[in-house]
């Protein structure tokens, strides 16, 4: 079975197709069923200066039918996960290298989100040997109040996942990429099992990885002395970095964490 697979999972109208179309550039809609998006696959080729990689975006939707009422979505997700963790799905699980869980943030319920994140945590434990990345991606059909978005992001972070709001783009106050730009960055910086180096030496590729990692944390503690971040801001940033570290391979974590510690100590 092909490797380099990303599972894109979520309920109806939560952005699964929008994510897949953005990453793949495939906006054809004739093959998309009105009843369910499960089973769709988008193929894409990601290219950077140093490598290219073929990636499959595997779409799964719960419940099985869009006619099911929303109050049954949690039980439908539990049923889906029960099938996913079964022996018959072992071959598929072995080739999953990333999971994008999609949610609609127009009207979200703390209790529902928590139950979904609990199931996602079980999935993370199930796939831990693959060392996949996990992203919770939110979409909205209208503007969301900043406080509401911050509450949702905090809830996701406290459960050990990174939250990305699809409608965003550009960079935040920490100079971290946001929204679509962050989603693309996650895929471009992941250590894919099968990739093709673009006529560069391994040393150049390792230098590229180091440069990418540095740029992802640029601005963490680079403010002028007159504009030192507050403790709340630093704690929020620490939560974001914790989520990033959890997605790294074991041999990458120590150096990255050591660098973070040194930078944080400059403030104390």
UniProtKB/Swiss-Prot annotation:
Keywords from the UniProt entry: Chromosomal rearrangement
Coiled-coil zones: none
UniProt GO BP: vesicle-mediated transport
Domain of life from the UniProt record: Eukaryota
GO molecular function: protein-macromolecule adaptor activity
Its biological purpose: Involved in gross chromosomal rearrangements (GCRs) and telomere healing.
Family membership noted in the UniProt record: Belongs to the IRC6 family.
Name of the protein in its database record: Increased recombination centers protein 6
Native species: Clavispora lusitaniae (strain ATCC 42720) (Yeast)
Taxonomic path: Eukaryota, Fungi, Dikarya, Ascomycota, Saccharomycotina
């Amino acid at each position: 079975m092909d490797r380099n697979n990303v599972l894109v999972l979520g309920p109806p109208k939560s952005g699964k197709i929008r994510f897949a179309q953005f990453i793949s550039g495939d906006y054809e809609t004739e093959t998309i069923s009105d009843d369910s998006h499960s089973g769709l696959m988008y193929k894409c080729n990601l290219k950077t200066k140093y490598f290219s990689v073929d990636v499959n975006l595997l779409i799964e939707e719960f419940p099985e039918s869009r006619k099911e009422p929303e109050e049954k979505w949690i039980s439908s997700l539990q049923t889906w996960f029960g099938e996913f963790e079964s022996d018959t799905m072992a071959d598929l699980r072995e080739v999953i290298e990333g999971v994008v869980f999609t949610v609609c943030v127009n009207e979200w319920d703390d209790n529902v989100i928590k139950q979904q994140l609990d199931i996602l945590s079980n999935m993370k434990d199930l796939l831990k040997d693959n060392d996949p990345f996990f992203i919770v991606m939110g979409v909205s059909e209208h503007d969301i109040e900043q406080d509401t978005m911050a509450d949702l992001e905090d809830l996701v972070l406290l459960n050990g996942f990174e939250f990305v709001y699809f409608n965003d783009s550009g960079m935040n106050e920490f100079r971290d990429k946001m929204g679509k730009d962050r989603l693309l960055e996650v895929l471009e910086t992941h250590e894919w099992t099968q990739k093709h180096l673009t006529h560069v030496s391994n040393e150049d590729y390792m230098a590229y990885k180091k440069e990418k990692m540095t740029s992802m944390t640029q601005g963490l503690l680079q403010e002028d002395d007159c504009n030192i971040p507050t403790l709340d801001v630093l704690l929020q940033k620490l939560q974001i970095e914790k989520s990033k570290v959890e997605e790294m391979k074991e041999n990458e974590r120590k150096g990255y964490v050591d660098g973070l510690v040194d930078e944080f100590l400059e403030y104390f």
